[in-house]
């Protein structure tokens, strides 16, 4: 993901000592491992560890592009192609992964694909040396930019499972409560200062 930092010029004008507000200084993607949910669906795939599935994406002009994702909720088409919900094709060593529609499909931890016990292909799982060279594409995909270095993935592939969000709900809720309390405390300080100034103004008026 591309980190976005605040490079806007600072103003030389100072009004009092209170900050005039806040804004986002940096945005980044958390690539940490999410929890795994067992679905039992043959074409639901999850990566245990680092790495990405390789996808062939066709744009509206009919041009093909390679993108990468950790979203493994795949399905099989009537022709046997393995695709995501948008019709993008999962890539194997042979290109688009295609399997017999009437066979029992087993995919092992290394990405080897078996049809009725016979090895037919190998799913491509890759990784990158520095995720700062990945640009977000759509909701769940990434595109490497100039300078990206592709490396071998150390993650294992889990069939019949899906990776869930890596957001820690309890932690985020705790942080939100802490922020709310800090806001309330600051609000009370402002109210106290306002009351003090009001009393001072009224006292001066009586003098």
Where are these regions (language model features)?
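Amphipathic alpha-helical polymerization modules
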Residues: 1-207
């Amino acid at each position: 993901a591309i980190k976005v930092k605040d490079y806007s010029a600072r103003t030389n004008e100072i009004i009092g000592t209170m900050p005039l507000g806040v804004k986002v200084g940096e945005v980044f993607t958390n690539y940490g491992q999410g929890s795994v949910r067992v679905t039992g669906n043959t074409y639901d795939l999850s990566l245990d560890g680092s790495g990405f599935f390789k996808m062939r994406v066709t744009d509206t002009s009919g041009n093909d592009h390679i993108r990468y994702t950790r979203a493994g909720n795949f399905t099989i088409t009537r022709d046997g192609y393995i695709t995501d919900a948008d019709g993008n094709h999962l890539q194997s060593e042979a290109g688009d992964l295609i399997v017999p529609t009437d066979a029992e499909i087993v995919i092992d931890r290394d990405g080897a694909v078996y049809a009725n016990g016979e090895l037919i292909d190998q799913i491509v799982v890759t990784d990158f040396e520095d995720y700062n060279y990945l640009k977000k594409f759509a909701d769940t995909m990434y595109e490497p930019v100039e300078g990206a270095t592709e490396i071998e993935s150390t993650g294992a592939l889990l069939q019949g499972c899906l990776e869930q969000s890596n957001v820690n709900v309890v932690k985020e809720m705790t942080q939100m409560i802490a922020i709310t309390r800090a806001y309330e405390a600051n609000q009370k300080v402002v109210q106290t200062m306002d009351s003090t100034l009001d009393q001072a103004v009224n006292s001066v008026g009586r003098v």
